[in-house]
């Protein structure tokens, strides 16, 4: 899973 916030 990949998550990138602002």
Curated annotation (Swiss-Prot):
Keywords: Toxin. GO terms for molecular function: toxin activity. The keyword Oxidoreductase does not apply. There is a cross-link at residues 1-6 (Cyclopeptide (Val-Pro)). It comes from the Eukaryota. Processed by the macrocyclase-peptidase enzyme POPB to yield a cyclic hexapeptide. POPB first removes 10 residues from the N-terminus. Conformational trapping of the remaining peptide forces the enzyme to release this intermediate rather than proceed to macrocyclization. The enzyme rebinds the remaining peptide in a different conformation and catalyzes macrocyclization of the N-terminal 6 residues. Cyclic hexapeptide that belongs to the MSDIN-like toxin family responsible for a large number of food poisoning cases and deaths. Cycloaminide B is non-toxic to mammals but shows immunosuppressive activity, probably through the inhibition of the action of interleukin-1 and interleukin-2. Belongs to the MSDIN fungal toxin family. This is Cycloamanide A. It comes from Amanita phalloides (Death cap).
């Amino acid at each position: 899973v990949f998550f990138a916030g602002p």
